[in-house]
Amino acid sequence: MNGNEPHGGVLINRCDPACHFEGCACQAELDQLALSDLELIAIGGYSPLTGFLGEKDYHSVVKEMRLANGLPWSLPITLPVGEKTARQLSAGDHVKLVKDGVTYGMITVTDIYQPDKTQEALSVFKTNDPAHPGVKKLLARPDYYIGGPITVSSLPDKSFEQFYATPAETRAAFQKLGWKTIVGFQTRNPVHRAHEYIQKTALETVDGLLLHPLVGETKSDDIPSDIRMESYQALLNHYYPKDRVMLSVFPAAMRYAGPREAIFHALVRKNYGCTHFIVGRDHAGVGSYYGTYDAQNIFQSFTEEELGIKPLFFEHSFYCRKCGNMGTSKTCPHSPRDHIHLSGTKVRELLRQGKKPPKEFSRPEVAAVLIKGLHQQPVAIKQNSGELQ
């Protein structure tokens, strides 16, 4: 395993502000998922991808979790278009990529194909239940895919620009800080004591932590990213060593693909310069579609050498009254009745009532931010199950 090397050996950069669009045959309207994928391809987050998957790579990823050349890649990164657009295109055509009247770049078409969405859903999400948010999104998108390399002339407006960094920029920051080993942590939820315990346990063995919250498209009942970002800052300011942690946003959308998304999240953090990646229980899960530790077990499908990043597996952590500290079933011998564990639903109920969860569960500074933020939300938002992600 060559630490810190991008996936595939080269950090991709598909940004070209001088890109011209005069020769484009037509344009394709992007949805929010495609726009975030376009951005991450362009800045190298999805290295070695230089564009949206062609048909051969698509089928290989769906069936084998590998690109056609054998390199591990667990999620199909595709660009859907409607039948009318698909039928007027040919290989070699240039297509403008737009959203809401803004042109972001273009794709040079190599492939035009119609996927079997039922098979894609069953392979990627382990279900074709339309109630699953990832399946619902898949089925709602247009029925044809176009593949080929992309060129991006301008990136989307940056959310939380102060905390935005490309893979090249995080790598440069790690080098400047002198970090040789970096553990990445993916989250779409607030960080409570259980997450803090796991992060700090990992931090004992590496040089630095990249706290990399996802701020792209999520379910409507996930906590809004602006509230989460404020809660992360409150936590880091009070409880983490400032020279050992970097907070940076991850502009991807959630797919809720559970085990496959855990592999994907690890590979992407490898591109950002991480050497290690934390995988907790039900990583990127939703509802009861995946087993508690499926997202850890899937790593057995690959060697650590071919992934190029070391997964760190953690069991569910909790505060034990008898131990007087945080722990897991590996370190605590006591009964579950001695453990403080609140469901996400219960935590949200307390926060909405203006009540702080027990200090053993959530830092008071974090709870205060969440209470304030949720009371300012015009629409009630339910907390998803209290999984670590």
Swiss-Prot record:
Annotated signal sequence range: none
Catalytic activity entry: sulfate + ATP + H(+) = adenosine 5'-phosphosulfate + diphosphate
Alphabetical UniProt keywords: ATP-binding, Nucleotide-binding, Nucleotidyltransferase, Transferase
Biological processes annotated in GO: hydrogen sulfide biosynthetic process; sulfate assimilation
Keyword Transferase: yes
InterPro entries given in the database record: ATP-Sase_PUA-like_dom, PUA-like_sf, Rossmann-like_a/b/a_fold, SO4_adenylyltransferase_pro, Sulfurylase_cat_dom, Sulphate_adenylyltransferase
Source domain of life: Bacteria
EC number: 2.7.7.4
GO MF entries: ATP binding; sulfate adenylyltransferase (ATP) activity
Transferase recorded as keyword: yes
Homology family: Belongs to the sulfate adenylyltransferase family.
Protein name per Swiss-Prot or TrEMBL: Probable sulfate adenylyltransferase
Organism: Bacillus subtilis (strain 168)
